Amino acid sequence: WDGDGIKDLLLATNMHHMIPDTIRGIPWSRPKPLRGATLLFLRNAGTEADPVFEFPKQLKYKGELVRFGHHGCGASTGMIGKITDGLPNVVVGDERGSIYLLEREHLSW
Protein backbone atom coordinates (compact mmCIF):
# COMPACT_ATOMS: atom_id res chain seq x y z
CA TRP A 1 0.00 0.00 0.00
CA ASP A 2 2.92 2.35 0.58
CA GLY A 3 4.10 1.95 -3.01
CA ASP A 4 7.16 -0.25 -2.49
CA GLY A 5 5.54 -3.27 -4.19
CA ILE A 6 5.26 -5.32 -0.97
CA LYS A 7 1.83 -5.92 0.57
CA ASP A 8 1.16 -4.00 3.79
CA LEU A 9 -1.76 -4.13 6.25
CA LEU A 10 -4.45 -1.50 6.67
CA LEU A 11 -6.66 -2.33 9.66
CA ALA A 12 -9.90 -0.81 10.89
CA THR A 13 -10.62 -0.78 14.63
CA ASN A 14 -13.44 -0.06 17.02
CA MET A 15 -13.48 2.78 19.57
CA HIS A 16 -11.81 0.71 22.31
CA HIS A 17 -8.74 -0.19 20.27
CA MET A 18 -5.35 -0.66 21.87
CA ILE A 19 -2.37 0.53 19.83
CA PRO A 20 1.12 -0.75 20.75
CA ASP A 21 3.49 2.05 21.70
CA THR A 22 6.21 2.24 19.04
CA ILE A 23 8.98 2.46 21.65
CA ARG A 24 7.84 0.33 24.60
CA GLY A 25 5.53 -2.04 22.72
CA ILE A 26 2.94 -1.79 25.49
CA PRO A 27 -0.61 -1.32 24.16
CA TRP A 28 -2.37 1.90 25.12
CA SER A 29 -5.74 3.48 24.53
CA ARG A 30 -6.27 7.03 23.34
CA PRO A 31 -7.62 9.54 25.88
CA LYS A 32 -11.39 10.07 25.74
CA PRO A 33 -11.47 13.13 23.43
CA LEU A 34 -9.37 11.24 20.84
CA ARG A 35 -11.25 7.94 20.99
CA GLY A 36 -13.14 6.56 18.04
CA ALA A 37 -12.89 3.80 15.48
CA THR A 38 -9.76 4.41 13.46
CA LEU A 39 -7.45 3.08 10.75
CA LEU A 40 -4.04 1.59 11.43
CA PHE A 41 -1.24 1.17 8.88
CA LEU A 42 1.29 -1.65 9.36
CA ARG A 43 4.14 -1.39 6.88
CA ASN A 44 5.67 -4.67 5.75
CA ALA A 45 9.42 -4.23 6.21
CA GLY A 46 10.00 -7.83 5.14
CA THR A 47 9.10 -9.60 1.92
CA GLU A 48 5.97 -11.18 0.46
CA ALA A 49 7.27 -14.63 1.44
CA ASP A 50 8.54 -13.56 4.88
CA PRO A 51 6.51 -10.53 6.07
CA VAL A 52 7.74 -8.44 9.00
CA PHE A 53 5.19 -5.82 10.00
CA GLU A 54 6.25 -2.64 11.74
CA PHE A 55 4.32 -1.25 14.72
CA PRO A 56 0.90 0.09 13.73
CA LYS A 57 0.60 3.78 13.00
CA GLN A 58 -2.71 5.60 13.19
CA LEU A 59 -3.64 7.25 9.91
CA LYS A 60 -4.11 10.99 9.69
CA TYR A 61 -6.22 12.80 7.10
CA LYS A 62 -5.23 16.39 6.41
CA GLY A 63 -3.07 16.27 9.55
CA GLU A 64 -5.87 15.12 11.90
CA LEU A 65 -6.16 11.64 13.41
CA VAL A 66 -8.81 9.61 11.59
CA ARG A 67 -11.81 8.76 13.82
CA PHE A 68 -15.13 7.15 12.86
CA GLY A 69 -17.84 6.66 15.51
CA HIS A 70 -17.72 4.22 18.39
CA HIS A 71 -18.59 0.71 17.28
CA GLY A 72 -16.27 0.30 14.36
CA CYS A 73 -15.48 0.98 10.76
CA GLY A 74 -14.38 -0.98 7.73
CA ALA A 75 -11.81 0.07 5.15
CA SER A 76 -10.64 -0.89 1.71
CA THR A 77 -8.28 0.61 -0.83
CA GLY A 78 -9.17 1.39 -4.41
CA MET A 79 -8.27 3.32 -7.52
CA ILE A 80 -11.29 5.60 -7.22
CA GLY A 81 -11.56 9.35 -6.88
CA LYS A 82 -8.65 11.64 -7.63
CA ILE A 83 -5.43 9.63 -8.10
CA THR A 84 -2.36 11.86 -7.95
CA ASP A 85 0.54 9.48 -7.38
CA GLY A 86 -0.63 6.18 -8.87
CA LEU A 87 -1.38 4.75 -5.40
CA PRO A 88 -4.87 3.78 -4.18
CA ASN A 89 -7.11 5.94 -2.03
CA VAL A 90 -8.92 4.58 1.04
CA VAL A 91 -12.67 4.04 1.28
CA VAL A 92 -14.17 3.79 4.79
CA GLY A 93 -17.63 2.73 5.91
CA ASP A 94 -18.81 3.58 9.42
CA GLU A 95 -21.47 2.28 11.82
CA ARG A 96 -24.13 4.66 10.49
CA GLY A 97 -23.77 3.43 6.93
CA SER A 98 -21.84 6.48 5.76
CA ILE A 99 -19.05 6.00 3.23
CA TYR A 100 -15.99 8.24 3.09
CA LEU A 101 -13.31 8.63 0.44
CA LEU A 102 -9.91 9.49 1.91
CA GLU A 103 -7.69 10.75 -0.89
CA ARG A 104 -4.16 9.43 -0.70
CA GLU A 105 -2.55 12.85 -1.15
CA HIS A 106 -4.09 13.94 2.19
CA LEU A 107 -3.13 10.80 4.19
CA SER A 108 -0.14 10.54 6.50
CA TRP A 109 0.96 8.32 9.38
Region spans (language model):
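Beta-propeller-forming repeat regions
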Residues: 1-109
